[in-house]
Amino acid sequence: MNAAVISPKRLLESWRTHRLLILTVVFLIFGILSPLIAKLMPELLKGGLGGIKVAVPKPTSLDAWTQYYKNITQMGIYVFALMLGGCVSQEIQQGTLVNLVTKGLPRWTVIVGKAIVGMLLWIWITSLAFLVTWAYTAYYFPDTRSPHVVLAFLPLLVFGLFFLSLIVFGSTLATNNYGGLLLTIVVMALLYLAQMVKSWQHANPVALIGDNMKILVNSDALTKLMPAMVIAVVAAVVLFFAAIKLLDRKKL
């Protein structure tokens, strides 16, 4: 039994535990709401000012995409972490890995299986929200102010690999679901603090979810993020490898 065999079982497990369904619904809502909120925001602002006349700029496609990236990076990634936070620790607690290991399953395939399924989930939910936002944005705001929507989306996918590796590593290291989630939040907080250092900004994985709007209007901005993308991928490989080593030493 190897990772290629175990991955379909992990996908089925995600469906049975409603993890896939919950993530799909949440991110679908993000996709629908992002352009809708941008469309309604001027009216909401006018209504909240109690009749005071204020010049509110007409919303554009940029407002819809700004809302999309805010929803994904400020809420979506943490919903994802919450759903997958116990992906390893929970199975160790429940003893479900014991039978697999006694049947000859190498422990490394558990981590690789989690990585494959987790990345498939990330690609699915972010792409779903992206496509829905794109469709509604094209309908509500048929302008040309957002020429590079696909390029702006690519760093988000790469960040997902890094973020997933952090979740899997934390879940393997921790003895419970909350420990792994806490580690993920702490590391993210440290990365956000590091982003305040100007010389580190283009090498920080957090930049992959912070500079998307710059890429949206100027494709050259993607080149500046190459160091962050490389570091994110390398860090992900290191964290997955570390998770494998940790699981090898864990008592199941």
Give the role of each language-model region.
Residues 87-119:
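Helix-loop-helix units of permease transmembrane domains in multi-pass membrane transporters
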Residues 234-252:
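Junction motif at the cytosolic side of a transmembrane helix
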Residues 13, 90, 103, 134, ...:
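Transmembrane helix-loop junction
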Residues 64, 84, 95-96, 208:
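Hydrophobic alpha-helical segments typical of transmembrane helices
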Residues 1-28:
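Aromatic- and glycine-rich beta-strand/loop motifs that create alpha-glucan
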